[in-house]
Amino acid sequence: MIAHGLPIYVALEPVDMRLGSERLGALVRDRMRAEPRSRALFVFVGKRGHSMKVLTWDGTGVIVVHKKLDAGRFELPCATQPGEQHLLVSDAMFDVIHKGVAITPRNARRRVH
């Protein structure tokens, strides 16, 4: 279903998962400065972190895929520049994100001397 080799843009700010294809498309235009009907995947995560929507266009229509984790949360990569609202990620990074795998170790602690 999700085609590999397409550009994958991940929104860094959480979105309301009640949004449908039209409103998600508007976010793609406004926040990502991209065209929703381009050959790309646009990834959005909900405020609680357990839901994800992927918007894409297959050449004949818009597709919205909604995934909800049974346990855990989707973890997004950090912005690389101040004020950045989205990131272009690799297929491998998208695989990590959409499976709900932690990007940063949760039990890592700083040592205090």
Region spans (language model):
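Polybasic/polar functional segments that serve as interface/processing modules
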Residues: M1-H113
